[in-house]
Amino acid sequence: MIINHNMSAMFAQRTLGHTNVQVGKGIEKLSSGYRINRAGDDASGLAVSEKMRSQIRGLNQASTNASNGVNFIQVTEAYLQETTDIMQRIRELAIQAANGIYSAEDRMQIQVEVSQLVAEVDRIASSAQFNGMNLLTGRFSRTEGENVIGGSMWFHIGANMDQRMRVYIGTMTAVALGVRNGVDESIMSIETADSANKSIGTIDAALKRINKQRADLGGYQNRMEYTVVGLDIAAENLQAAESRIRDANIAKQMVEYTKNQVLTQSGTAMLAQANTSAQSILSILR
């Protein structure tokens, strides 16, 4: 028997200290819900988890971007619907004016309505905006000649660099549609039967241009809607994977915490017992 070093007490103290650390970690995990709260808990797991979190947040933002893109396209298409309706009405008037039963005075009255409708086409083009950006005045159109790109709208629809989509919207002013002269600003004339007849072809070309643009917008919108679904699924799956790495299994952690609490209580009792065992040596010295 020795009295200078109480090995039992030293062992009990060391074990109790380790158990107390584990109890503290258990409280931390149970209160936060995370298995990994700092790099020391799992260095590689933390690194992987943080990379996944970056991707998840990027995917969620990209989904929002794509949804904004759908809204952008829907607003543009709504303005083009108005322009289409106006052009259809102008076409009706041109066909009416091309009929030989009308006098010059009659055609002048028809021309008044046509002039007002053409002015409305320009008003729509100038007032069609999304977040302060003009949509139909050529800001997002291709520049003709030598296949040079003039402008476009970019939508970032991915979590990483260069994962984006380009959208083009042509110029839809009266000049671009051919119903107003770009030099002298004169409006397409239907004051004679022949001029009204020629105007029908001009309007058909304008409607073809508008319909082509609307078809393009429909394609853009469908793509973006599928993109939103894909991004949401990707974010959901990646979140599940990240959760398996970082989140705590509460049932498992509770079992571990309860075990460590019992060990703490028993360790405390055994440390007290080990400290008192040395006193039994005094009976030998009496």
Curated annotation (Swiss-Prot):
Effect in UniProt of substituting I233A: Peptide of residues 229-247 no longer binds FliW
Keyword check for Transport: no
Chain coiled-coil ranges: none
SUPFAM superfamilies: Phase 1 flagellin
Localization: Periplasmic flagellum; Periplasm
InterPro entries: Flagellin (IPR001492), Flagellin_C (IPR046358), Flagellin_C_sub2 (IPR042187), Flagellin_N (IPR001029)
Region (Required for interaction with FliW): 231-286
Keyword annotations of the record: Bacterial flagellum, Periplasm
UniProt main location, coarse: periplasm
A GO cellular component entry from the record: periplasmic flagellum
Keyword Transport: no
An MF annotation (GO) of this entry: structural molecule activity
Functional note: Component of the core of the flagella.
Subunit structure: The flagellum consists of an outer layer composed of repeating units of FlaA around a core that contains several antigenically related polypeptides. Interacts via its C-terminus with FliW; a synthetic peptide of residues 229-247 partially blocks binding to FliW.
Family of this protein: Belongs to the bacterial flagellin family.
Protein name, UniProt field: Flagellin FlaB1
Gene name of this polypeptide: flaB1
